[in-house]
Curated annotation (Swiss-Prot):
Provenance organism: Drosophila melanogaster
Protein name: Protein nullo
GO CC aspect terms: adherens junction; cell-cell junction
Function field: Actin-myosin network stability during cellularization. Might be involved in increasing actin-actin interactions or membrane-to-cytoskeleton attachments. nullo together with Sry-a and bnk may provide auxiliary functions, by acting both to stabilize a large and dynamic microfilament structure and regulate its functions.
GO biological process terms held by the UniProt record: cell-cell junction assembly; cellularization; cleavage furrow formation; morphogenesis of embryonic epithelium; regulation of cell shape
Keyword Aminoacyl-tRNA synthetase tagged: no
Assigned keywords, A-Z: Developmental protein
Tissue: Blastoderm. Throughout the entire cortex of the embryo although the distribution is not uniform.
Amino acid sequence: MGSTHSAEKVKSVEDSTSPANPGIFCTPLPGFISNIQRLVLRKLSISARKQKRLNKRSKHLLRPMPRCSSFGSCGTLLTPTKKSASNIADRRYAQWKCSFEHLAQKQPRLHDISEAMTGQTTPRGFPSHTDPKRCLMVMDSSSPESPLYDMVGGQKVRRRLSLRSHALVRRPSARQKAEQAKLDAQFQRDLRDLEDYYGGFHFAQRRERLVKV
């Protein structure tokens, strides 16, 4: 008897909690529900695609800057990490862009980057840096290392230094002396004429002192 009583009690509780079926909508319309489901799924897929696109874009823009060692590939800074399947328009654009890049590579470079850093400009056709292998000069072992010494009998002898020019000075001939005397006389006449013309001009002779009174 106790079991039948408890079963009746559970049934009465279930009946009291379940809402009454309204009389207006007897059965739900299957076409209306499927339309709502389709609209909701479409909205969700559009928002998910938008979100994915935004995530992709931010991922491309916020990639970390490379270290100094990898600055050679700066063109890949804003490119995606994974290669997406390219359509024919992308391939055409890549070909168009590559044609310009190849043209730029074919043009001769004005100078090397080392020249831009050092300020050195090299003529066209010459290397910007001298190859040390081509600059090896054969040193003559017999010549002394220092210009202050002369090799005399296999021994180094200190050279006498003088400021005189070692070129051979020839003594002037009588004709050259006469020409020089003629030039000196003309020079003296010109000086005298200038002195007469300007007045207080005085040309100091040799061993003559100016005495102010």
